[in-house]
Amino acid sequence: MEIKEKKKLEVTVDKRHIVSIGERLYAESVELLRELVNNAYDADATEVRVEVSPAEVTVSDNGAGMDFAGLKQYFIIGSDEKVIHSRSPRFGRVRIGQFGIGKFASLAAASRFELLTRHKDFAARVVFDKKAWEEAKDEWHLPCEILNSDPQRGDGTAVILSELSKAFLVEDVERKLMETVPLKAPDFAVYVNGRRLYPRSLVGRRIPLLEGTKYGPVNGEIVITPKSAADFKDLGIEVKVRGATVKKDLFGMETWGKAVARVKGEINADFLPITSDRSSFIVD
């Protein structure tokens, strides 16, 4: 068939889908706080403070912060910045973020997303208002206010979620963060309403694990806890990628009966490909 004429078609995206990325990405609203805390870890923060109230949730850190170029990079959907630069500059941490969409998860539970950041002599505030964003159909920019910088305050970033559409319970936030952020990492502390979170400590017989595979190393520890410590509400072994728990797995122990409640521990396998919501692994 002969070509009569050549034309080009423009590929467009409805702005509403930017919001729906966050609304559909996570099953639990508390999971979005995991993303914000892990962003702080990637930014070389040594301290992250999460403040939860009925009116708003704030996640602030003392990490590197962002300059204007960093802010522009932050709001690129699907950015591979953390894949290209997979280690943080100060501590050499293996960065957890991979997909560049986690920040939009905040819109699943809040209509207003305010970001304040400081980096050296630069400071700025960006506001993402869901209603204003959807109403301005042809406007793809976010208001960014350049602020007077106070060097004495140091670098860092704060995210304030307000006009909440979902409630955050402090105990749920603590539980989720204790399960899914790298609390064992050196020089990294996380606080929720002023209370520091610590990684879970297990008592029992410890079995170290180290296995080489063609994809990369697998390491960790299995703990056989006493019968008195058996926990049927928290079954499975944590599988971690880049220091953050992705899921818990029984690894075929479903038929073990009551004994399965005594087997705990964690396995680290940084080479495993994970889904965009970090809840499972990609299986081909």
Predicted regions, residues:
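Glycine-rich, charged/polar anion/phosphate-binding loops
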Residues: 100, 143-146, 174-176, 221-225, ...
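GHKL (Bergerat-fold) ATPase N-terminal catalytic module, capturing the glycine-rich phosphate-binding loop
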Residues: 1-158
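Short amphipathic beta-strand/extended segments with alternating polar/hydrophobic composition
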Residues: 125-131, 138-139, 196-206, 246-253
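Glycine/threonine-rich ATP-lid/beta-loop region of ATP-binding domains
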Residues: 149-236
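Residue-level detection of beta-strand-connecting loop/turn positions
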Residues: 54, 121, 192-196, 241-243
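A generic structural motif
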Residues: 63, 161-167, 271-273
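Charged regulatory segments coupled to nucleotide-binding catalytic modules in large multidomain enzymes
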Residues: 1, 7, 11, 169, ...
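Short, charged, solvent-exposed linker or helix-capping segments at domain edges/interfaces
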Residues: 125-127, 139-140, 170-173, 276-281
